[in-house]
Amino acid sequence: MAKYFGTDGIRGEVANSTITVEFTQKLGNAVGSLINQKNYPKFVIVGQDTRSSGGFLKFALVSGLNAAGIDVLDLGVVPTPVVAFMTVKYRAAAGFVITASHNKFTDNGIKLFSSNGFKLDDALEEEVEDMIDGDFIYQPQFKFGSYKILANAIDEYIESIHSRFAKFVNYKGKVVVDCAHGAASHNFEALLDKFGINYVSIASNPDGLNINVGCGATCVSNIKKAVKEQKADLGISLDGDADRIIIVDENGQEIDGDGILNILAQYSDICGGTNGIVGTQMTNMSYENHYRANKIPFIRSKVGDRYVLEDLVKYGYKIGGESSGHVINLNFGTTGDGLFTAIQLLAIFSQADKPVSEFKLQGELMQQTLINVPLTKKVAREDLQKVASDVNDVEKRLGNRGRVLLRPSGTEPVLRVMVEADDKSLATNEAEYLVEKVKQKLV
């Protein structure tokens, strides 16, 4: 079991968890020393979101890397997918992002990309963890690394997207965008300006403390309200580091990551094509049934965009994602990318003269009830055996009307209890039953 890494890097409350200056410096030194051991290029890229703690954590990371003899190129405040993109483009050994994604500003963390722009696999994470727990390694003074800032790094990313999609995007509707006061602030607007989109931007004034507060992809009510007030045709909401996207239609109705994947699947020719779709254990059964009815191969990965990526590579598919809004298209990128997904959607919406609501899967979706149960410590999968009989009882009562999923969070001491059924009250009642059993046996 990983000691430091969760499902998406390392994350926690600043100063009251693993996320300290001391740890971040050791992480930088550990990765730098591993780069030396493997004889990779002695050069990495770093970026950050808008949290107030981002600066001092970044410089702690840089100091550890420089001590190990690694040169650092700092992109400043940029979306996470920009770091992945630039890591590949500049042939860096690794890319780091100081971010806690959709979490509150008091949290922070580190996401880490390998030279191919993919997140680290479990084996490489274990190597990094072993190095963290080892000695701090200094290179001889004449081999210390350098630190440089690359201004306007977003421009190269924007130009890459524009060169591929300019011929497809001719969207005439009015768009509202919610940047979560995060890394997309100003950067997403620059991308939309390049494509000539008519938009109104909200939650794009970061102050270091307001990231994800009442806004962004985990607070969809903000974009729903704005779409109605602006009488807009489309709303696009990103999270703090812009690797997630949720959209709403002209009626203010949410289309989550599952729905976005379905739209991309219908118009995959515009998006580079795919032989199948990868969802996750959380993907609504209605979409799975739809894919199978239309002979579109579909598989479920574990929750976490790096697991989606692993299965995309394993099965040779190109498009996949999560209900939460991580969407990956391997035709053009290597990680969840809210900005690029938005441009793909705008390209699709430009091709047909119909409202966004008509691109959605028609009919009622299966009803999901998801309850997060706080625990005193992270729960291991073997702990779930304590409630296995209770889960079995619920599954028997549901029969073929639904399913159950109990999933420990990879980033915090929380157990996610999800019940899906063809009736909302049934899903809610059974979920609440399981929550009580979890509290009795695991809390």
UniProtKB/Swiss-Prot annotation:
GO terms for biological process: carbohydrate metabolic process; peptidoglycan biosynthetic process; UDP-N-acetylglucosamine biosynthetic process. Activated by phosphorylation. It comes from the Bacteria. Its cofactor is Mg(2+). The active site is at residue 101. One of its GO terms (molecular function) is magnesium ion binding. Catalyzes the conversion of glucosamine-6-phosphate to glucosamine-1-phosphate. Belongs to the phosphohexose mutase family. This is Phosphoglucosamine mutase. It comes from Francisella tularensis subsp. tularensis (strain WY96-3418). The lineage of its organism: Bacteria, Pseudomonadati, Pseudomonadota, Gammaproteobacteria, Thiotrichales.
